[in-house]
């Protein structure tokens, strides 16, 4: 099941601005290792889940994984072959607006080589470039 908010104050949202780097959520908060975005882009709930499953399978139920992003922004879409006008379409799915520098996932309790390989596999599932980061003093 894809990630989506349980309840929202407003059903639909405007496009909004996507400029600038991540001001919050750009440092490790929980784990020893993290996956940090280098470019911007939308990340759907399905992509978050695909990356999570990939990391979990590589770790074989070892260590602890934190997901640091959540898809809050609704994306609407009109049905096929419908004329323009008549308002905005219904909500199709939700995305997380990812900015450069945002930490997406964190890991603890596994060796650095295992974490690096798990994040490399998860990076292939994501629509933007990411890098491996480690906490200060962590043995890499």
UniProtKB/Swiss-Prot annotation:
One of its GO terms (molecular function) is structural constituent of ribosome. Residues 1-24 are annotated as: Disordered. GO terms for biological process: translation. Keywords: Ribonucleoprotein, Ribosomal protein, RNA-binding, rRNA-binding, tRNA-binding. CDD domains: Ribosomal_L16_L10e (cd01433). PROSITE patterns: RIBOSOMAL_L16_1. Belongs to the universal ribosomal protein uL16 family. This is Large ribosomal subunit protein uL16. It comes from Opitutus terrae (strain DSM 11246 / JCM 15787 / PB90-1). The lineage of its organism: Bacteria, Pseudomonadati, Verrucomicrobiota, Opitutia, Opitutales.
